[in-house]
């Protein structure tokens, strides 16, 4: 029972989702030549860092979590783990994760983890989430860190491939998060969290969702155009982007925004999982014969 509580406070669903993206970035960079010890160190290291960030987030948000239907039964809200113990737990998880990334992967992977952690805990959770409509935008940067860490654990450098991954996953976070805010509108309103749909209205949020999906679509194609991923990835990326955009556009005519937003959110998970899988298996070695070179 105690183990279950300590597991729940780390938000295992979020950890699992991030692991899929880490694997995508790692295998994309590995290009078929997998260093398995490095793979394990990277996965476990990122998992521990994400777990640490989630525990800190639970600690910081325990006051507003009480006001939201979705979060009112969280471990810290119900007092199943004391706040002091959660801080120690989060700190130990973070130290272990950063050490694994530093010594098991490379310093760059560790520093990327540190930056993602600081943005999520220090900038987003402590301030932006409660005080700015741009909190989601800032938080998207930390959400995009795991695949970049996986990629850079292999390459040891932040190149154009890493930049494209950062763009893809940051842009994906925006419509994904706005969809949550729409179908959980009353929760965010009750907790006085200034997300875009609450502050500017759902109609404005729909416009932003559409624009971000278009930008996401362009970013996903750049992996193939830049010679990092192959044609099969390109086809899947184009297909999921077009379908997701179509779902967003249908949102302008729906009668129930909450049902529409939940479906949009659900497909966002399918889309990013499909891309992570395809970049894992359909990689290319960048050379002069990239799609971008062929275009020019």
From Swiss-Prot:
Keywords: Cell inner membrane, Cell membrane, Heme biosynthesis, Membrane, Transferase, Transmembrane, Transmembrane helix
Topological domain spans for side Periplasmic: 29-37, 98-107, 217-228, 288-296
Superkingdom: Bacteria
Record has Cell inner membrane as a keyword: yes
Reaction catalysed by this enzyme: heme b + (2E,6E)-farnesyl diphosphate + H2O = Fe(II)-heme o + diphosphate
Gene Ontology CC terms: plasma membrane
GO molecular function: protoheme IX farnesyltransferase activity
GO biological process, any: heme O biosynthetic process
Pfam family, one: UbiA
Cytoplasmic side: 1-9, 57-78, 127-197, 248-268
Pathway: Porphyrin-containing compound metabolism; heme O biosynthesis; heme O from protoheme: step 1/1
Membrane-spanning parts: 10-28, 38-56, 79-97, 108-126, 198-216, 229-247, 269-287
Membrane-topology annotation of the record: Multi-pass membrane protein
Task of the protein: Converts heme B (protoheme IX) to heme O by substitution of the vinyl group on carbon 2 of heme B porphyrin ring with a hydroxyethyl farnesyl side group.
Note: Carbon 2 of the heme B porphyrin ring is defined according to the Fischer nomenclature.
UniProt xrefs under HAMAP family: CyoE_CtaB
Family the entry assigns: Belongs to the UbiA prenyltransferase family. Protoheme IX farnesyltransferase subfamily.
Protein name: Protoheme IX farnesyltransferase
